[in-house]
Amino acid sequence: KPIAARCQETSEGIRNKDALVLQATSTLPLSYEEINPITCLDEVFHAHATEDINYGVMSSGLRDLSAKADTVVVEGSGGWRVLMNDLRPYAEWVVQEQLPVVLVVGIKLGCVSHALLTAQSIINDGLPLLGWVANRINPGLAHYAETIAALQQRIPAPLLGEIPYLPRAEQRELAHYLDISTLL
């Protein structure tokens, strides 16, 4: 997670909950800074944020991690076209690094349009869309199965798995919900 908003000050420094989960579940012993080199205390990065978005730091960190591991998974930050404080989209860095993409779709009202636009944007940016994951964030969503079917028919990449609605999902083992055999 090279960049994270909604961080909190802790006794160990500024930390992000998702990055801490990634650090704890990494197959390699990595420092927090290797997992999350750029942090922001605000809800989002914005034009007036004091944190500097340095793509060089992100790229250097990616190279360092790639030298240590067979596979590096880079978690996104806020969506494909989210703007960083220098008003460049996060996707610009992903394109610069030519990273393949797995799209995570929060299954909720309006997600079909958002997911299809995001998938098309990733493809238009010239990156491979390796697959997508359905993340059920609303347990009461009507027509859940129909929504998944509509996305499967329209996203030009395989469904890698469905994460059911789970309270405290970050505290649970989720790997068994995914089939990443097509990615290996």
Predicted feature descriptions by range:
Residues D42-M84:
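Phosphate-binding/switch loop-helix module in NTP-utilizing enzymes
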Residues S26, E97, R154-P156:
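Short, structured coil segments at secondary-structure junctions
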Residues K1-D52:
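N-terminal phosphate/diphosphate-binding loop that engages ATP/GTP or pyrophosphate donors
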